[in-house]
UniProtKB/Swiss-Prot annotation:
Lineage, highest ranks first: Bacteria, Bacillati, Actinomycetota, Actinomycetes, Mycobacteriales
Membrane-spanning residues: 25-45
Ranges of compositional bias, category Polar residues: 248-265
One of the record's GO cellular component terms: extracellular region
UniProt main location, coarse: membrane
Compartments where located: Membrane
Organism: Mycobacterium tuberculosis (strain ATCC 25618 / H37Rv)
Protein name per UniProt: Uncharacterized protein Rv2575
Amino acid sequence: MTFNEGVQIDTSTTSTSGSGGGRRLAIGGGLGGLLVVVVAMLLGVDPGGVLSQQPLDTRDHVAPGFDLSQCRTGADANRFVQCRVVATGNSVDAVWKPLLPGYTRPHMRLFSGQVGTGCGPASSEVGPFYCPVDKTAYFDTDFFQVLVTQFGSSGGPFAEEYVVAHEYGHHVQNLLGVLGRAQQGAQGAAGSGVRTELQADCYAGVWAYYASTVKQESTGVPYLEPLSDKDIQDALAAAAAVGDDRIQQQTTGRTNPETWTHGSAAQRQKWFTVGYQTGDPNICDTFSAADLG
């Protein structure tokens, strides 16, 4: 998906450094989500080994130093990954504002290496995640390359935008007061952890439904151009690439649904599609669904 070049990027809620403290667990997307939790706690595997098997080559992918001064227009979002992440956050905010009365924007932080959060310290091995304490979505953009080289995703800009929309989906859950369910009997293919992540996938699909029609208030220009078939394929590939079953099979050679916390590849694809086809966040009630797919 390509941003319209006339869109103006708002970086006012985005930072690239800072610290915090706390003890609550951050909530991950499962494809950007807290891989430390998914891999290490559930599978008994060092996440550092998984994420560092291949070197990253982002020379033509990231402008150096997370320089947000380069993020001015949609053209910059199409060129630089950090600008694309910020612009996607702008788009997701614009979509949710009319859908959820009282919606407030989350903060966004771009980081590399180590970062302090309201949920405690984190590292680049964590990947993108959302912390409900400071209401901030954290993104290490190197993860998008890892998603391709380590997990077999097809990549593409819309796969990256989907990850952002998923983490913002956790913010929506936080505003609705349902995010805490992730900590209640979190494991298992039908557990609350899986239901929480699948709902965030569905919310990402809802964003995709509106992404090319919702206009920026200040310019009157839609944030994004219409979705292509490849965009959807890239999002579905990203969702599937780090489904619990895919990660377990890759890491241990077997799958164990009793330890799932994020959902299978098929489940994640299903719920993104549900949101994308309907544009109705009420359909995303995974907590009441008898069949998660």
